[in-house]
């Protein structure tokens, strides 16, 4: 791991635990094992580190989870839909970088406009638009009954978002949260899929 990557890793851990304002550049440098002035060889300052973290997490999420622009292959069956959706949710809930990033975003969404936008996109708008496209594709293939794909996306994603937030607050409930999400997903499929 390069020094630049070590800085990001340390900063993410500290920002997630202490918040952006509760973390000083000296804390980050200390964890990395460098002097604070050496950190400025890699980043202009704490805000530059924060922006690099968000950019990195966005790229990771795009590749591993998808987005409105990158929905992946439209599932061809109920079981494929459940499998792919649970894999995405498992990644979101369990990936340490995404989890820490989410904790940072939740804390800082009221103090930083960019973070507010990213949080809304990942927890509401973007995920709903992504699943609306997937559901619409499955409607077009006759797998999902004809209905409003946007409303179905809300119905599908809202419980998952709430359970992920619960697992972040209460990690000991992660298994229970995943079971609930899968139960809800199977119910959704039973109601809306052929």
Question: What is each PLM-predicted segment?
Answer:
Residues 6, 10, 14-56:
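Helix-turn-helix
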Residues 46, 53, 57-61, 81, ...:
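Hydrophobic/aromatic residues within well-ordered alpha-helical segments
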Residues 52, 66-99, 150-156:
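Hydrophobic alpha-helical connector segments
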Residues 57, 61-65, 96, 113, ...:
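Short amphipathic alpha-helical interaction/hinge segments
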Residues 86-94, 102-111, 188-192:
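Helix-loop "lid/cap" segments that line or gate small-molecule binding pockets
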Residues 94, 100, 106, 113-140, ...:
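Amphipathic alpha-helical packing segments from all-alpha helical-bundle domains
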Residues 117, 121, 135-186:
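Hydrophobic/aromatic-rich alpha-helical bundle segments in the mid-to-C-terminal region
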């Amino acid at each position: 791991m390069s020094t630049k990557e070590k800085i990001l890793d340390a900063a993410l851990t500290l920002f997630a635990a202490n918040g952006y304002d509760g973390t000083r550049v000296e804390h980050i440098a200390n964890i990395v094992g460098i002097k604070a002035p050496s950190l400025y060889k890699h980043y202009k300052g704490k805000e530059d580190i924060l922006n690099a973290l968000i950019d990195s997490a966005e790229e990771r999420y795009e590749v591993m989870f998808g987005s409105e622009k990158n929905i992946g292959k439209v599932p061809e069956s109920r079981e494929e839909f459940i499998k792919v959706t649970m894999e995405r949710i498992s990644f979101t809930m369990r990936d340490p970088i995404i989890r820490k990033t989410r904790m940072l975003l939740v804390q800082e969404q009221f103090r930083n406009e960019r973070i507010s936008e990213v949080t809304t996109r990942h927890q509401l708008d973007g995920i709903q638009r992504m699943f609306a496209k997937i559901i619409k594709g499955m409607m077009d293939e006759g797998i999902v009954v004809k209905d409003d794909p946007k409303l179905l996306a809300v119905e599908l994603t809202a419980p998952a978002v709430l359970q992920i937030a619960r697992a972040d607050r209460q990690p000991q409930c992660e298994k229970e949260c995943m079971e609930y999400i899968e139960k809800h997903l199977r119910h959704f499929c039973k109601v809306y899929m052929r």
